[in-house]
């Protein structure tokens, strides 16, 4: 279960890098520039209300469950999007461990739009080149980390390791452009799915070590064929519903999964039957009464702006919905510790 979750997180990174890059490139080609202010403001409006509310709920629970469940140091790491580096340094985020992947994503989004806006003066090829350079650096770091015997959590939770699938997704989006889904031979797609299944089947410690590389390869081989998926599936109301609420579901699944796994030692099937329904209900409630009302309020910071890529944030969270429920068990990094 945890191996599948680790693979799911890596695939989410790849999907996220692909989608946000495609949206940024589309905005640049439409407007001749990327509205960075709109991008960052809209991300804050989309992400922070639910995150703050979920951390507040965990803090209240921590008052009864004790410091093993919650501390204010954990909350600070989550709110500042430094959770992954807290785990790399050996600290335990307990019920907020799942926020490490949000930290990785936001660190990427802090720098990548700036870089895309600059290098797009040279066209999509320049974006592919820069992303490819980042992938090469990431692979070099990965080989070095394995060679020197770095701990698994140093590889899995680090920004360097997670950059591989993120940049691979970004490079794929820039390379695809207006190319047909058949630009890459379909047999490559089968290799990509094979890598995904292999990662999910391997022992968990092996999976988390090689996940940055295997998921990056899978993203490069599978994503170019995404457009060939049946339209009714991609446009289904159920997928859109889960996509819009997947971020909240992910936030609420994490504390439940940690408590049931680490404290009560529930089996995976018991967690699946309990955590997923509870997360869906709480996530749906959060989206309806916290996120949606906040997003409907006009922001003075977004007046007189060009149409930004961040307007399509629901397209991004739709991708999150493909992995959010399966990824939760793997977020508890200490569960893999000796």
Where are the predicted features?
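Interfacial loop-to-helix transition and helix-capping segments at the boundaries
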Residues: 1-9, 67-77, 91-104, 146-168, ...
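Structural signal for the C-terminal ends of transmembrane alpha-helices
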Residues: 21-29, 61-64, 117-123, 171-180, ...
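Membrane-interfacial alpha-helical segments at the cytosolic side of multi-pass membrane proteins
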Residues: 20-22, 54-60, 108-121, 168-175, ...
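Transmembrane alpha-helical segments and their boundary/interface "anchor" motifs
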Residues: 26-62, 77, 101-110, 134, ...
């Amino acid at each position: 279960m945890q191996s599948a979750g680790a693979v799911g997180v890596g695939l989410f990174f790849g999907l996220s890098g692909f989608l946000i890059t495609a949206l940024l490139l589309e905005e640049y080609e439409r407007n001749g520039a990327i509205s960075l202010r709109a991008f960052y403001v809209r991300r804050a409006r989309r992400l922070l209300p639910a995150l703050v509310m979920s951390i507040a709920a965990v803090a209240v629970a921590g008052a009864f469950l004790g410091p093993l469940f919650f501390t204010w140091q954990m909350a600070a790491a989550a709110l500042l999007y430094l959770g992954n580096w807290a785990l790399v340094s050996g600290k335990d985020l307990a019920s907020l461990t799942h926020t490490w992947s949000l930290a990785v994503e936001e660190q990427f989004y802090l720098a990548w739009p700036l870089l895309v806006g600059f290098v797009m003066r040279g066209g999509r090829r320049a974006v592919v080149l820069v992303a490819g350079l980042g992938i090469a650096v990431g692979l070099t770091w990965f080989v070095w980390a394995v060679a020197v015997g770095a701990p698994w959590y140093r590889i899995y939770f680090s920004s360097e390791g997670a950059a591989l699938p993120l940049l691979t997704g970004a490079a794929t989006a820039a390379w695809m452009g207006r190319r047909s889904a058949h630009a890459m031979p379909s047999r490559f797609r089968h290799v990509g799915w094979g890598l995904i299944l292999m990662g999910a089947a391997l022992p968990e410690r092996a999976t988390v070590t090689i996940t940055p590389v295997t998921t990056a390869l899978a993203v490069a081989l599978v994503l170019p064929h995404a457009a060939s998926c049946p339209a009714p599936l991609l446009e289904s109301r159920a997928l859109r519903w889960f996509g819009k609420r997947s971020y909240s579901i992910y936030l609420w699944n994490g504390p439940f999964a940690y408590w049931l796994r680490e404290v009560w030692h529930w089996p995976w099937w018991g967690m699946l039957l309990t955590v997923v329904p509870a997360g869906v209900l709480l996530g749906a409630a959060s989206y309806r009464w916290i996120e949606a009302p906040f997003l409907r309020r006009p922001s003075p910071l977004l007046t007189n702006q060009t149409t930004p890529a961040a307007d399509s944030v629901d397209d991004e969270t739709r991708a999150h919905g493909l992995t959010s429920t399966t990824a939760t068990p793997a977020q508890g990094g200490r569960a893999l510790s000796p």
